[in-house]
């Protein structure tokens, strides 16, 4: 207790002086408590002293107990060791007896088996000498099993002697079997009734011998069977290509006539199968020798007949023996190339096709299961893995060039014929609006593909595919030649075409048919490549590509659509000339729309409905975009070709401009293709708004004309502004102050505009039309001159709308560039 606590305690016990009288009793009480505590402490100390002595005694007792326990454990361990020694002494004698018993048992068993082996070998020797094949086969199996037990005793002289004796017996059996089989096929089987049974029993002996004996016997039999074949067909009379079918008739007749006799062979030997393999190898060698040694080019008919019979024979072998790679039935796929069907018909046809294939596969699996169940392995050589397909026919591959040349000549001649007979029109009610020549062309190609598919799926098919490419390119060139030539205008400048194009209503329909036919050829050529890549050997699949052909047709589509635009431009030239001849400076009042506007409406009303009906939405969209991009700038530039405009004349021209704009905006509904209306309307409004803005500048007062021009044409140029002042009828002296003020404030850009760069109206002779007289030059033109445009259009490989948008963007952007592939093409 600290000092402060003691003071608090005293103050608490004696708060007043009167309470001090209780100090003495309190002191006595405390002293009594102290004495009691001291006595308690002393008692505890004494008790603790007595406890320490007790603990020492207990520890000593525990130590003695541990020592006694350790002594007892040692005694137990010693007794256990003694017991173990006694047990080992007892078991030592028992183990010796056990080993002795085991050795005696093994010796007795070995001696018994040795006795059996000696007896079996002696019996086998007797059976071999008597040619008792059936009994010898069973005995040989037993001897082989007994010999397996003596593998560990190979060095024992008696065992070595027995093995040598057994090998000699096996050689005797082998020689007897081979000797007996040499009489097979000589006619003795009819004289000796038991010969076939003896040979059948000898096959059991061969199975019991080493596998090499069976291989040697089968090979000898096949070689002996084919000896007469070699002698017959190596002679000068039958060693000809036109006698090939007789070779296969010989082996089929041989198998058919000897089918009962050859049943002596176990089914697991697959003797007819092995015979056919050797026959195919020998036939391939002979046929290849005939083809190589031919002095003259083979007649295609004979060559194809020999190849056809060879392929059919290989299919028969593959069907009979199996083991080939499963082939995909592509006849239906070839028929589907270039078909035009709606979705419901297409889905139904696909479903039926795959149901048919599934049923065929199920039937094949069931047949295979049934064959395995019945054990008829002669019909299906399970696990043989030998592919008869191409075993003989592949030797024809290097010599089929005449066939490919004939196919190419036939296809090219047919192409010339169908193009000459083409009416360049489509029957009413046709859904695809495709020229009959394109569908007929692919019909001929499909027939050619079917013919080749039955003959070859390797180099020959690949060479034929190259022929298809050349034929399709030739057709693309003919479509290209059919398009009208020449052209003028902005689109012509952008695409490198010069001269005007005059097209009639029939010409417009023909151009649309060419576009649709080129699109059909583009799509169908891709399907053709896919089908060929599926059926051709995988080594050639990577080379099956129709991208070049598709690019050719894409180029035809691009040029055809641009030609349509150029044709309408040519029709508009007359109306544009009428517009410049209107006396705009002397008009007295604003009336209805001018005659040239009605002329533009007549041109569009006569062409647009037909084009909208015949062209697909994608191509019609491209046509509209190019038409709008052509008419807008042409109309704008044509205003500058006019002479002086009075205020009334400018108001009339503004009314005409709005009428032309309305006419252009009505084109999608006129063509009944409203899906393109939104983007097209925005495009037309943008292009025609420039012409409206120009007329608003012309109508503005003299004192504000510069400000109005700068506001409406931030990119305007001084040259264009000066031309506007001339249209307003200002004299040179009056123009100068306005021009000085305009130049003082400065335009937004100094780049010369298209309208300012246009020459003054003057008669210009038409440029010579585009003409290509050489087909090779035409093909080069398609592949080279329009290659950039074709790639920009991205029409190849099915791309459509996106490609045309890219083409539009590229051509528009190229106008102001001084270099680059597009600019160089435009300047060509």
Swiss-Prot record:
Predominant location: cytoplasm
Subcellular location field: Cytoplasm; Golgi apparatus membrane; Golgi apparatus, trans-Golgi network membrane; Endosome membrane
Impact after mutating residue 393 to Y: In hit1-1; reduced tolerance to both heat and water stress, lethal at 37 degrees Celsius. Altered vesicle trafficking leading in changes in the plasma membrane components
Record key words, sorted: Coiled coil, Cytoplasm, Endosome, Golgi apparatus, Membrane, Protein transport, Transport
GO CC list: cytosol; endosome membrane; GARP complex; Golgi membrane; mitochondrion
Coiled coil as UniProt keyword: yes
Organism superkingdom: Eukaryota
Disruption phenotype: Lethal when homozygous. In hemizygous plants, male-specific transmission defect.
GO biological process per UniProt: heat acclimation; plasma membrane organization; protein transport; response to heat; response to osmotic stress; retrograde transport, endosome to Golgi; retrograde vesicle-mediated transport, Golgi to endoplasmic reticulum
Tissue specificity comment: Present in pollen. Mostly expressed in vegetative tissues, including leaves, siliques, and stems, and flower buds, and, at lower levels, in roots and mature flowers.
The UniProt record lists the keyword Repeat: no
Gene3D superfamilies linked to this entry: Vacuolar protein sorting-associated protein 53, C-terminus (1.10.357.110)
Parts forming coiled coils: 53-152
Membrane topology: Peripheral membrane protein
Family: Belongs to the VPS53 family.
Assembly and oligomerization: Component of the Golgi-associated retrograde protein (GARP) complex, composed by VPS52, VPS53 and VPS54. Interacts directly with VPS52 and VPS54.
Purpose of the protein: Acts as a component of the GARP complex that is involved in retrograde transport from early and late endosomes to the trans-Golgi network (TGN). The GARP complex facilitates tethering as well as SNARE complex assembly at the Golgi. Required for vesicle trafficking involved in plasma membrane protein composition. Probably involved in pollen tube elongation and other polar growth. Confers basal tolerance to long-term heat stress and osmotic stress, by acclimation of the plasma membrane.
Protein name: Vacuolar protein sorting-associated protein 53 A
Source organism per UniProt: Arabidopsis thaliana (Mouse-ear cress)
């Amino acid at each position: 207790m600290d000092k402060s606590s003691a003071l608090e305690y005293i103050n608490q016990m004696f708060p007043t002086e009167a309470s001090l009288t209780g100090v003495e009793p309190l002191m006595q009480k405390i002293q009594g408590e102290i004495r009691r505590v001291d006595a308690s402490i002393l008692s505890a100390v004494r008790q603790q002293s007595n406890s320490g002595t007790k603990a020492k005694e207990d520890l000593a007792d525990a130590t003695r107990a541990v020592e006694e326990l350790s002594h007892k454990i040692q005694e137990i361990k010693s007794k256990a060791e003694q017991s173990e020694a006694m047990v080992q002494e007892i078991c030592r004698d028992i183990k010796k007896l056990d080993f002795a018993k085991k050795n005696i048992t093994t010796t007795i068993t070995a001696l018994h088996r040795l006795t059996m082996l000696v007896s079996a070998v002696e019996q086998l020797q007797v059976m071999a000498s008597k040619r008792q094949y059936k009994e010898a086969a069973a005995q040989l199996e037993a001897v082989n099993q007994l010999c397996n037990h003596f593998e560990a005793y190979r060095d024992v002289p008696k065992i070595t002697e027995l093995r040598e004796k057994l090998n000699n017996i096996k050689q005797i059996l082998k020689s007897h079997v081979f000797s007996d089989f040499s009489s097979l096929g000589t006619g003795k089987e009819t004289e000796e009734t038991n010969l076939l049974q003896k040979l059948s029993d000898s096959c059991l002996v061969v199975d019991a011998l080493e596998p090499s004996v069976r291989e040697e016997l089968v090979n000898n039999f096949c070689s002996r069977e084919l000896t007469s074949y070699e002698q017959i067909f190596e002679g000068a009379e039958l060693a000809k290509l036109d006698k090939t079918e007789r070779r296969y008739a010989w082996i089929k007749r041989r198998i058919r006539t000897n089918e009962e006799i050859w049943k002596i062979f176990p089914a697991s030997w697959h003797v007819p199968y092995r015979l056919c393999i050797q026959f195919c190898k020998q036939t391939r060698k002979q046929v290849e020798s005939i083809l190589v040694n031919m002095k003259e080019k083979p007649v295609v008919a004979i060559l194809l007949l020999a190849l056809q019979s060879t392929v059919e024979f290989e299919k028969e072998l593959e069907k009979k023996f199996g083991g080939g790679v499963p082939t995909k039935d592509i006849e239906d796929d070839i028929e589907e190339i270039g078909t035009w069907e709606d979705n419901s018909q297409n889905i139904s046809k696909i479903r039926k096709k795959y149901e048919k294939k599934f049923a065929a596969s199920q039937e094949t699996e069931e047949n295979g299961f049934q064959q395995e169940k019945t054990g008829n392995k002669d019909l299906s050589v399970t696990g043989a893995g030998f592919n008869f397909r191409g075993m003989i026919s592949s030797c024809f591959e290097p010599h089929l060039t005449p066939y490919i040349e004939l196919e190419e000549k036939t296809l090219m001649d047919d192409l010339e014929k169908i193009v000459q007979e083409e009416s360049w029109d489509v029957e009413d009610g046709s859904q695809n609006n495709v020229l009959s020549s394109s569908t007929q062309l692919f019909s001929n190609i499909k027939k050619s593909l079917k013919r080749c598919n039955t003959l070859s799926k390797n180099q020959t098919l690949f060479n034929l595919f190259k022929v298809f490419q050349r034929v399709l390119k030739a057709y693309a060139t003919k479509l290209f030649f059919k398009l009208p030539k020449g052209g003028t205008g902005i689109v012509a400048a952008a695409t490198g075409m010069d001269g005007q194009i005059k097209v009639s209503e029939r010409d417009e329909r023909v151009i649309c048919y060419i576009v649709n036919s080129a699109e059909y050829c583009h799509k169908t050529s891709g399907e053709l490549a896919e089908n060929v890549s599926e059926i051709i050997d995988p080594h050639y699949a990577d080379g099956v590509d129709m991208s070049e052909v598709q690019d050719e047709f894409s180029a035809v589509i691009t040029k055809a659509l641009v030609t349509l635009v150029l044709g309408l431009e040519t029709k508009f030239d007359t109306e544009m000339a009428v517009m410049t001849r209107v006396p705009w400076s002397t008009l007295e009042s604003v009336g209805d729309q001018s005659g040239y506007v009605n002329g533009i409406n007549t041109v569009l009303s006569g062409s647009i409905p037909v084009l909208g009906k015949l062209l697909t939405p994608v191509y019609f969209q491209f046509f509209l975009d190019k038409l709008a991009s052509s008419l807008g700038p042409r109309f704008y530039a044509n205003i500058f070709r006019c002479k002086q405009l009075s205020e009334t004349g400018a108001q009339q021209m503004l009314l005409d401009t709005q009428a032309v704009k309305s006419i252009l905006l009505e084109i999608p509904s006129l063509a009944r293709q409203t899906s393109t209306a939104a983007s097209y309307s925005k495009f037309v409004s943008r292009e025609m708004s420039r012409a409206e803005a120009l007329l608003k500048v012309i109508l503005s007062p003299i004192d504000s004309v510069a400000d109005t021009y700068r506001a409406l044409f931030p990119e305007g140029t001084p040259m264009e502004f000066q031309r506007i002042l001339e249209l307003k009828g200002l004299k040179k002296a009056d123009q100068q102050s306005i021009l000085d003020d305009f130049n003082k404030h400065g335009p937004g850009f100094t780049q010369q505009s298209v309208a300012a760069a246009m020459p003054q109206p003057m008669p210009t002779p038409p440029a010579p039309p585009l003409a290509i007289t050489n087909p090779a030059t035409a093909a080069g033109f398609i592949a080279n001159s329009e290659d950039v445009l074709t790639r920009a259009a991205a029409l190849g490989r099915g791309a459509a709308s996106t490609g045309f948008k890219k083409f539009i963007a590229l051509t528009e952007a190229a106008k102001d560039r001084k270099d680059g592939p597009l600019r160089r093409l435009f300047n060509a």
